[in-house]
Amino acid sequence: MASAMYAGAQTGSNPVEDLPRAAPHAFVVGENFAGMRSQALGLAHRAVWDGTFQPVCPSRVARVALAGPRWLGRPCLRGSEGQMLESHKDLLRSDVVISVGGKGGAIGAALRAHCRPVVPIQNPRQSLARFDLLIACRHDDISGPNVLRCRTALHGLTPA
Protein backbone atom coordinates (compact mmCIF):
# COMPACT_ATOMS: atom_id res chain seq x y z
CA MET A 1 0.00 0.00 0.00
CA ALA A 2 1.30 3.48 -0.87
CA SER A 3 2.03 5.89 1.92
CA ALA A 4 -0.52 8.64 2.58
CA MET A 5 1.93 11.23 1.31
CA TYR A 6 2.24 9.57 -2.10
CA ALA A 7 -1.52 8.97 -2.30
CA GLY A 8 -2.07 12.71 -2.09
CA ALA A 9 -3.44 12.76 1.45
CA GLN A 10 -1.79 15.22 3.80
CA THR A 11 -0.97 13.47 7.09
CA GLY A 12 -0.50 16.67 9.07
CA SER A 13 0.56 20.26 8.75
CA ASN A 14 4.21 19.26 8.59
CA PRO A 15 4.62 15.59 7.62
CA VAL A 16 7.92 14.07 8.65
CA GLU A 17 9.51 11.34 6.56
CA ASP A 18 12.73 9.49 7.17
CA LEU A 19 15.03 11.61 5.05
CA PRO A 20 18.65 10.62 4.62
CA ARG A 21 20.91 12.57 6.95
CA ALA A 22 24.51 13.48 6.51
CA ALA A 23 26.82 11.60 8.83
CA PRO A 24 27.97 13.59 11.87
CA HIS A 25 31.42 15.06 11.41
CA ALA A 26 34.39 14.38 13.70
CA PHE A 27 37.44 16.65 13.81
CA VAL A 28 40.33 14.36 14.76
CA VAL A 29 43.52 15.79 16.30
CA GLY A 30 46.72 14.02 17.25
CA GLU A 31 50.33 13.50 16.33
CA ASN A 32 50.79 12.21 12.81
CA PHE A 33 51.75 8.63 13.68
CA ALA A 34 50.14 5.69 11.85
CA GLY A 35 48.95 4.02 15.07
CA MET A 36 47.36 7.18 16.45
CA ARG A 37 45.69 7.97 13.14
CA SER A 38 44.41 4.40 12.89
CA GLN A 39 42.90 4.46 16.38
CA ALA A 40 41.19 7.84 16.03
CA LEU A 41 39.87 7.34 12.51
CA GLY A 42 38.88 3.77 13.43
CA LEU A 43 36.67 5.15 16.23
CA ALA A 44 35.16 7.70 13.85
CA HIS A 45 34.47 4.97 11.30
CA ARG A 46 32.82 2.63 13.84
CA ALA A 47 30.68 5.49 15.17
CA VAL A 48 29.64 6.26 11.57
CA TRP A 49 31.14 9.73 11.78
CA ASP A 50 32.81 11.43 8.85
CA GLY A 51 36.29 11.99 10.27
CA THR A 52 38.93 14.51 9.19
CA PHE A 53 42.42 14.09 10.64
CA GLN A 54 44.39 17.21 11.56
CA PRO A 55 47.98 16.55 12.67
CA VAL A 56 49.19 18.57 15.66
CA CYS A 57 52.52 18.83 17.44
CA PRO A 58 52.34 21.41 20.26
CA SER A 59 55.58 22.25 22.06
CA ARG A 60 55.99 21.78 25.81
CA VAL A 61 55.35 25.48 26.34
CA ALA A 62 52.18 25.24 24.25
CA ARG A 63 50.92 22.25 26.28
CA VAL A 64 51.45 24.19 29.53
CA ALA A 65 49.62 27.21 28.06
CA LEU A 66 46.78 24.99 26.81
CA ALA A 67 46.29 23.60 30.33
CA GLY A 68 45.81 27.12 31.70
CA PRO A 69 43.16 29.77 31.08
CA ARG A 70 41.54 29.77 27.64
CA TRP A 71 42.98 33.18 26.70
CA LEU A 72 46.51 31.95 27.40
CA GLY A 73 46.24 28.83 25.24
CA ARG A 74 44.39 30.36 22.28
CA PRO A 75 47.57 31.32 20.31
CA CYS A 76 48.79 27.71 20.73
CA LEU A 77 45.78 26.15 18.98
CA ARG A 78 47.63 25.44 15.77
CA GLY A 79 48.00 22.46 13.48
CA SER A 80 51.43 21.02 12.75
CA GLU A 81 51.73 23.29 9.70
CA GLY A 82 50.93 26.44 11.71
CA GLN A 83 47.29 27.01 10.72
CA MET A 84 44.87 28.23 13.40
CA LEU A 85 42.56 25.41 14.48
CA GLU A 86 39.74 27.46 16.03
CA SER A 87 38.79 28.79 12.60
CA HIS A 88 39.56 25.59 10.66
CA LYS A 89 36.66 24.85 8.29
CA ASP A 90 36.47 21.20 9.33
CA LEU A 91 36.33 22.10 13.04
CA LEU A 92 33.58 24.64 12.45
CA ARG A 93 31.34 21.98 10.87
CA SER A 94 32.23 19.22 13.33
CA ASP A 95 29.87 17.68 15.85
CA VAL A 96 32.60 16.10 17.98
CA VAL A 97 36.36 16.33 18.47
CA ILE A 98 38.33 13.11 18.79
CA SER A 99 41.83 13.52 20.19
CA VAL A 100 44.51 10.90 20.56
CA GLY A 101 47.51 10.84 22.88
CA GLY A 102 48.82 13.47 25.28
CA LYS A 103 49.56 16.18 22.71
CA GLY A 104 46.27 15.59 20.91
CA GLY A 105 44.52 15.60 24.29
CA ALA A 106 45.93 19.03 25.13
CA ILE A 107 44.65 20.46 21.84
CA GLY A 108 41.34 18.57 22.10
CA ALA A 109 40.59 19.85 25.61
CA ALA A 110 41.22 23.41 24.43
CA LEU A 111 38.83 22.91 21.49
CA ARG A 112 36.01 21.67 23.74
CA ALA A 113 32.84 23.74 23.42
CA HIS A 114 29.32 23.52 24.86
CA CYS A 115 27.92 22.12 21.62
CA ARG A 116 31.05 20.15 20.63
CA PRO A 117 32.15 17.38 23.01
CA VAL A 118 35.70 16.02 23.05
CA VAL A 119 36.44 12.28 23.15
CA PRO A 120 40.11 11.45 23.72
CA ILE A 121 41.64 8.06 23.04
CA GLN A 122 44.52 7.00 25.33
CA ASN A 123 45.54 8.77 28.52
CA PRO A 124 45.48 12.52 27.81
CA ARG A 125 47.86 13.12 30.76
CA GLN A 126 45.74 15.89 32.25
CA SER A 127 42.58 16.30 34.29
CA LEU A 128 39.93 13.86 33.06
CA ALA A 129 37.26 16.44 33.97
CA ARG A 130 38.24 18.43 30.86
CA PHE A 131 36.70 15.71 28.65
CA ASP A 132 33.21 14.37 28.03
CA LEU A 133 34.07 10.70 27.45
CA LEU A 134 37.50 9.04 27.44
CA ILE A 135 38.34 5.78 25.71
CA ALA A 136 41.45 4.12 27.10
CA CYS A 137 43.07 0.71 27.17
CA ARG A 138 43.51 -1.04 30.48
CA HIS A 139 47.26 -0.41 30.33
CA ASP A 140 46.61 3.37 30.33
CA ASP A 141 45.70 2.87 34.01
CA ILE A 142 43.03 5.57 34.25
CA SER A 143 39.51 5.30 35.60
CA GLY A 144 36.61 7.57 36.35
CA PRO A 145 32.92 8.12 35.65
CA ASN A 146 33.65 9.35 32.12
CA VAL A 147 36.21 6.64 31.19
CA LEU A 148 35.36 3.73 28.90
CA ARG A 149 38.08 1.09 29.15
CA CYS A 150 38.85 -1.39 26.39
CA ARG A 151 41.12 -4.42 26.22
CA THR A 152 43.12 -3.49 23.13
CA ALA A 153 43.91 -0.47 21.00
CA LEU A 154 41.12 0.77 18.77
CA HIS A 155 41.36 0.53 15.00
CA GLY A 156 39.07 0.34 12.02
CA LEU A 157 39.94 -3.19 10.91
CA THR A 158 37.70 -5.51 12.93
CA PRO A 159 34.26 -5.14 14.49
CA ALA A 160 34.11 -3.97 18.10
Predicted feature descriptions by range:
Residues 2-81:
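N-terminal pre-catalytic "stem/leader" segment of glycosyltransferase-like enzymes
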Residues 25, 95-96, 117, 133:
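Structural motif
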Residues 36-37, 104-108, 127-128:
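Short, well-ordered alpha-helical microsegments
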Residues 40, 106-119:
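Glycosyltransferases and closely related glycan-assembly transferases
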Residues 78-93:
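Short, well-structured alpha-helical segments in soluble
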Residues 99-100, 118-123, 135-138:
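Short beta-strand elements of ligand-binding domains
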Residues 103-104, 141:
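Alpha-helix capping/helix-boundary segments
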Residues 128-160:
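A nucleotide-sugar donor-handling region in carbohydrate enzymes
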